[in-house]
């Protein structure tokens, strides 16, 4: 029996390249990549190049935890996190006092002179006084300027605002009180004659025919009415003048504001302002009488429908 020997397998060119590539990778994996790279670069060069380090031999960075083990942090109060922020008021609905303060600061430098005093003839001062009168507060007297309006002291400004609010409250309070008194007195006078004097409501035209008779129920009624009106008007003027509210109520008139604006162009109007203010005061007093007469007319009109 003859020995049979196997001939070595013939490797193809592709397999040779693959084996060569695997051997090269194995050498580089052993840390020889840098030497091989320098050997290749130095071939064909008469000058020795500097050492080059292969990226395969560079140490790969390892991920390290940056967390520092320390004590547990302080626990924050949940009320500080969960509490909602204060609501922001809508545009245009801010506090009126804050708006007045801003407007006051804007004109403060223009109102005050070089010596820090207020010039009564300054048109800006007059405009500010008109705005102050329009808010329903006790405005300054004729020809006077309230320098405390433009004070830099916030305490003084707060005091002036509180004083204005108090004067406005006093005006409304006393006017409402006198209104109740006027209505009660007029109704009492009317129903007293209606219930106690038979001829007061005997006919639709009894208040005309009774003028020629012995009893004059309508004349007596108007006599008591006139007496009550005089007493009420005098008390109204006394209370408002004593509290300093009578003049303040007159200064809120649109006529006085127009005259104050016109006096910037025609200074002669300042001469007539006291007269107009006095006329407006009398007009308010007569308005009380006219209002009570209107109530009497309504009562007599209702009386004419009862018979």
UniProtKB/Swiss-Prot annotation:
Q: Does the entry annotate any disulfide bonds, and if so which pairs?
A: none
Q: How does it sit in the membrane?
A: Multi-pass membrane protein
- Which residue stretches does the UniProt record annotate as biased composition, category Polar residues? 41-52
Q: Which residues lie on this side of the membrane: Cytoplasmic?
A: 1-173, 241-284
Q: Which residues lie on this side of the membrane: Lumenal?
A: 195-220, 306-307
Annotated Gene Ontology cellular component terms: endoplasmic reticulum membrane; GET complex; Golgi membrane
Q: Does the keyword Transmembrane helix apply?
A: yes
What is the first-listed, main subcellular location in coarse terms?
endoplasmic reticulum
InterPro entries in alphabetical order: GET2, Get2/sif1
Mind telling me which residue stretches traverse the membrane in this protein?
174-194, 221-240, 285-305
Q: Where is this region: Disordered?
A: 41-73
- Give UniProt keywords alphabetically: Endoplasmic reticulum, ER-Golgi transport, Golgi apparatus, Membrane, Transmembrane, Transmembrane helix, Transport
Q: Establish whether keyword Isomerase is in the entry.
A: no
- What is the residue range of the signal peptide feature? none
User: What are its GO biological-process terms?
Assistant: protein insertion into ER membrane; retrograde vesicle-mediated transport, Golgi to endoplasmic reticulum
* Compartments (UniProt record): Endoplasmic reticulum membrane; Golgi apparatus membrane
| Function of the protein | Required for the post-translational delivery of tail-anchored (TA) proteins to the endoplasmic reticulum. Together with GET1, acts as a membrane receptor for soluble GET3, which recognizes and selectively binds the transmembrane domain of TA proteins in the cytosol. The GET complex cooperates with the HDEL receptor ERD2 to mediate the ATP-dependent retrieval of resident ER proteins that contain a C-terminal H-D-E-L retention signal from the Golgi to the ER.
Subunit structure as annotated in this protein's UniProt entry: Component of the Golgi to ER traffic (GET) complex, which is composed of GET1, GET2 and GET3. Within the complex, GET1 and GET2 form a heterotetramer which is stabilized by phosphatidylinositol binding and which binds to the GET3 homodimer.
**Similarity comment:** Belongs to the GET2 family.
Q: What is this protein called?
A: Golgi to ER traffic protein 2
According to the entry, what is the taxonomic lineage of the organism?
Eukaryota, Fungi, Dikarya, Ascomycota, Saccharomycotina
Please name the gene that encodes this protein.
GET2
């Amino acid at each position: 029996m003859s020995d049979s020997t196997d001939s070595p397998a013939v490797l193809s060119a592709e397999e040779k390249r693959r084996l060569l590539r695997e051997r090269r990778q194995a050498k580089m994996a052993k840390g020889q990549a840098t030497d091989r790279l320098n050997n290749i670069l130095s071939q064909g060069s008469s000058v020795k190049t500097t050492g080059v380090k292969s990226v395969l031999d560079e140490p790969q960075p390892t991920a390290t935890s940056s967390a520092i083990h320390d004590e547990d942090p302080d626990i924050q109060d949940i009320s500080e996190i969960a509490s909602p922020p204060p609501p922001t008021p809508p545009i245009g609905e801010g506090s009126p006092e804050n708006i007045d303060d801003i407007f006051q600061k804007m004109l403060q430098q223009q109102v005050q002179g070089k010596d820090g005093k207020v010039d009564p003839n300054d048109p800006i001062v007059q405009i500010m006084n008109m705005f102050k009168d329009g808010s329903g507060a006790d405005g300054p007297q004729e020809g006077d300027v309230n320098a405390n309006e433009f004070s830099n002291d916030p305490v003084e400004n707060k005091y002036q605002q509180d004083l204005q609010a108090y004067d406005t409250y006093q005006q409304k309070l006393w006017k409402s009180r006198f209104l109740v008194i006027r209505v009660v007195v007029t109704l009492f006078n009317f129903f007293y004659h209606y219930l106690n004097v038979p001829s007061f409501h005997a006919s639709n035209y009894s208040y005309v025919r009774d003028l020629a008779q012995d009893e004059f129920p309508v004349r007596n009624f108007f006599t008591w009415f006139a007496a009550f009106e005089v007493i009420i008007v005098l008390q109204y003027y006394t209370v408002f003048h004593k509290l300093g509210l009578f003049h303040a109520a007159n200064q809120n008139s649109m006529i006085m504001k127009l005259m104050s604006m016109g006096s910037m162009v025609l200074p002669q109007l300042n001469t007539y302002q006291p007269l107009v203010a006095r006329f407006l005061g009398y007009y308010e007093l007569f308005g009380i009488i006219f209002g009570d007469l209107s109530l009497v007319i309504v009562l007599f009109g209702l009386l004419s429908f009862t018979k």
